[in-house]
Amino acid sequence: MGSASMTVQEKGTGMTVTKVTPVLFAQEIEPCVSFWVDRFGFEKTAEVPEGDRLGFAMLQKGAVELMYQSYASADKDVKDAEIAQLARKGPTFLFVEVDDIHATIEAAKGAPVIMPLRTTFYGATEISVKDPAGHVVTFAQFGAQA
């Protein structure tokens, strides 16, 4: 999920990819920050105010990084209205690999469950919940028993 710490050399481009970080858009960022910080132990590493609210926040846990930007901030940041509207087309779907699905389920208690705990054909035990902005977060552990 999120930030990948490995470096990948692309064929024929001469470009090295060093990290991928999702930017998730929300009406209000504060509940999303609390979702990740309070439940899953992420740290807020950066924030940019937008009036009396947050316009942007960066969250990190180990090598995993997430960014949230408010719709209002995106509207100001991207001057093209058509592009700014793309932020509202969501939700985004995240796939988060964890080492203890049962501890993760406990931490996620109270979040709306989109897909109950299941074992997949590809060997993952997973559950999907919604974050406060409506983005779907699938937590998965490979090799676990449901």
Task: Cite the ranges covered by each PLM segment.
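Conserved active-site tyrosine of GNAT-family acetyltransferases
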Residues: 32-37, 108, 134
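Vicinal oxygen chelate
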Residues: 2-23, 43-97, 103-130, 141-146
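Short acidic-aromatic low-complexity motifs
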Residues: 26-30
